[in-house]
């Protein structure tokens, strides 16, 4: 558990699967005796309610040891009018793998952005959405601040269950660096 009271959710009980079929390696990673490690990061409030914060494998660990939960930040960004979806990722700044800055790819609806913010050109759209990101940054601890923005009208790469494929999206970003970046 970290300093914010967030840790991996582990469960046991009669409705929990007894293991992965013919996959001993996966069983070793996921099971600790009777306890199943879900891979979900969760927090329990004072009343005992469990809140899922994100996935363990998607956490971005900063040089100061602080954790960024992309799903938490994406939910904030996705509330911006004209934003269809977003993808938070860490961009490495030096040889130190934990020296990262938080960036976001925003998939936007051009028509809605034009109507809501009277933004027509790519630069006007960038300015309108950057202003909204700055407002969100003002509500977050400084270490969580979004430092870079990529705009796209193309949907994010997702699984058949509509979950963001984080590595594939990051690979696409690294491949196509000619995207409008601020």
What function would you assign to each model-found segment?
Residues 87-90, 134-182:
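Conserved C-terminal "lid"/linker of ANL adenylate-forming enzymes
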Residues 38, 63, 127, 159-161:
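Ser/Thr-glycine-rich phosphate-binding loops at phosphate-binding pockets of nucleotides
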């Amino acid at each position: 558990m970290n300093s914010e009271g967030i840790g991996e959710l582990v469960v046991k009980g009669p409705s929990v699967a007894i293991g992965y079929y013919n996959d001993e390696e996966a069983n070793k990673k996921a099971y600790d005796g009777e306890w199943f490690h879900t891979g979900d990061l969760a927090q329990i409030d004072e009343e005992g309610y469990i809140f899922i914060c994100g996935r363990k494998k998607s956490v971005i660990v900063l040089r100061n040891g602080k954790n960024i939960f992309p799903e938490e930040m994406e939910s904030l960004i996705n509330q911006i009018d004209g934003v269809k979806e977003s993808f938070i990722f860490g961009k490495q700044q030096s040889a130190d793998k934990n020296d990262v800055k938080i960036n976001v790819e925003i998939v936007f609806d051009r028509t809605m952005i034009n109507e809501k913010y009277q933004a027509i050109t790519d630069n006007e759209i960038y300015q309108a959405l950057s202003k909204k990101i700055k407002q969100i940054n003002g509500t977050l601890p400084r270490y969580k601040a979004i430092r870079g923005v990529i705009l796209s009208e193309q949907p994010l790469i997702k699984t058949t269950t509509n979950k963001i494929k984080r590595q594939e999206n990051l690979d696409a970003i690294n491949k196509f660096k000619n995207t409008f970046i601020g």
